[in-house]
Structures are given as C-alpha cells and as structure tokens.
Amino acid sequence: MLPAMQTRTATDTAWFTDARLGLFVHWGIYSLAARHEWVMTREKITNEDYRPYFDHFDPDLYDPRQWARDARAAGMQYAVITTKHHDGFCLFDSALTDYKATNTPGGRDLIRPFVEACRAEGLRVGFYYSLIDWHHPEFPVDGHHPRRDDLPFREAEAGRDMAKYRAYLHGQVRELLTNYGQVDVLWLDFSYSWRDWGWSKGKGADDWGAHELLEMVRDLQPNVLVNNRSEVRQDFFTPEQYQPRAWMHVDGAPVMWEACQTLNGSWGYDRDNLDWKSPGMLIRMLVDGVSKGGNLLLNVGPTARGEFDPRARATLAAVGSWMHHHARAVRGCTQAPADLPAPPDCRYTWNPKTGRLYVHLFAWPFRHLFLDGLAGKVAYAQFLHDGSEVRLGEYEEAGHYPTVRADAAVLAIPVQPPVGVEVPVIEVFVRR
C-alpha cells in the first residue's frame, strides 16, 4: 500500500477525464534487441555488452507526424513517450549525460519532433521518465539491477552515492519541463520500497527525493498531471496490465485512474511476441474502464528504425474505425448512476452533461434488452454505428413473456447483430 504522502496537485484535470484514450510509446535502444524493454536486466547484460545497441541506433524511418496521425485516427487525445527508460538511455538532448540519442548514429533529439508532431495533430503531450537508471554510475545496485548476481561488481560498487544520482534525476526532470514547452502529463516509473532482497532493499519516495522533486515540478508546470509512482500521491493512479473490478478508491474516496495496456505481451518492440490482443478485446477494455471512471493508455513499441509495426498500425486503425462512430460513448463519459445497473454482458457509460446513457453490448442479446430503472424515462434510443432507431419493446408479465422488474424499460433488439461492429452501442436519450 502506498504511503500516505501528498504534495501540490494539478488544478485542471477535466481534459484528462474527457479524453479517456491515450497513446503510450516505449522506445529506446532496447528496440534493437527486439526482445522486451527489460532485456538488459532479464539477461543480466553489462553496460559494455549493451553498448552495441547504442552504437547502432539509427532510426532513419522515424516519422513522429505519422505516429501522431495514427494516434489521432485511433481516437486518442494525448500521447506519452519514454524520454528515458530503466536502461538510462535518453531520447532527449540532456546536458547532464552523453548517453543520449544525439550521440548515436541517428544524431538528433528524438523528443522535440515528437512534441511538435503531437501538437500539430491536436494531441496533448506526456513524458514518461524512469526514476530507475541501470546505466548511471551512482545508481545503487539492487535486486532489479542487471549486475545483481555479480558479487565482485556489487562489492566494488558498494560506495555508489544515491544523493548524486538523485541530483541527476531532478536535473533531467527540470530539463524536460523547461525545454519543451507545455507538458500535460509527467509519467514517473516506478517505486518499489517494499522490496527486500536481503542484501539490498527497494527504492521509493525518500530515495528519489520525491517531495522536493514534485515541488519543483509544480513550480515549473503547475498544471501538469503526475501519476502516483513516486510514492507521493498526485493526480492519477496507474493499474498496469489489468482492469480494475470497480472505480479505484483510495482511503475510501474515488480517484482518477488510467489503465496502461500493451498491444501484445511487451512494452518495447518485441519481434517474436505473438500475444497480440484483438481490436475487440482492446475496445472492451476501453469501455470497461470508462464504465468505471477510468482512462486507457494503449502502448505501441516502435521498431529500431522508428516505425510502428504493421500489426500495431492495423490494430490502431481498427480501434479508430470503432471510435469514428462511437467516440461520444467514450469521451466525456463516466460511470453511470448507481441506481442504473447494466444488463448482463453489457457496460454502461454515461455523459453527465447531455444526460445520455450508452449501452455497450459485449454479447448480443436475444430480441429484448431490459434496462432496469428506466421505465418511462427513455425518450429515444438508437444504434450509434448507423443512427438507426431502437424501438421500445412491449411485453407482458404473464404468458410467454418473462417477469421483469416493474421499473425496467425494454428495448426491441434485432435478431442479428450489426456486421463489422466490434462492440455495438445503443445511445439512450434519458428524460430528465
């Protein structure tokens, strides 16, 4: 459980809960290895043996405008990119290190064009920054470090100074929030103070100087949204690779949250990973999250040459096709009122401004759909994919018709589902 620590938070969060869908990008020199972004520690690779990826990183096909167009077409409203991951390699031109994209064969800052492309396509900009750094000479070796099992190395490096690394961390965050204009999201990753390997302990808020870090962040960019992973409570929580069973609560109160999910089984480019989620599954995850008051941050791991994998682009396009017709059942929507329970195999999303209820059909019902609590309150209903009317059904409580709640509205549903619609949605105009 996270410690009960908090500092200043953002004042403008409405855009985030309105957007509901964002792009996550995990990109770095691990894309050359093409077998997971944690490859350095999974395979216990030394800095020297990891160096060829740095020496050969030349993303000659990098077109961030195309990335931004793909995200926009998928219905996404913001994009978050890894400025530095746990291996310590920086995509931005940091003055505090030589371990950066400008010193690779690619020879340029890769973050600035990403920021410009996002803004050109109307996307808000987010920066992921790893609190961990396996390359930095002062980052203390612990149980996550690639050299964790190298006892002579651990003994030789026992004097590493966390204070020096902490100053580096703070300095890089200052650079990111100073040199690229308005930043909408700061996605810090991650704390693990509860871990204990016997010979070393995990790291958390005190190690990062998180309170001081976040005070600096608020001085530089008061309205940037910051996640919870520094162990200091901020603006939103980040369930990873799972869908919460209900709206997330902390200390008994609902909080803003965003589920981050991969397209396959890896965050970074993983050539041989075949665990691709179907567009239908991803759409259901998006809807499920919105029905519980949450966002979805959907990840793509670009190739070493700077492109989205064709399978990733096809998935984004399929999500975008659905969003083209159904965006208003997602954006600006949230959990429905508690007295309106969704039918079996359905999710409700609710727009509190328009008073419209959206019924997302995860399974196709036979002929009738019963909406408890809405008898006499349905002014009109229609399918969103084509705007066709869904008529109110008629039923009797006796004879061949089932007994239903007296306060239920009944919608007459076609026997066949619409062709080519991953998740059909009925828009219900509720009488106020």
Segments the model singles out, each with a brief description of its role:
Residues M1-R432:
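Mature catalytic domains of secreted/periplasmic carbohydrate-active enzymes
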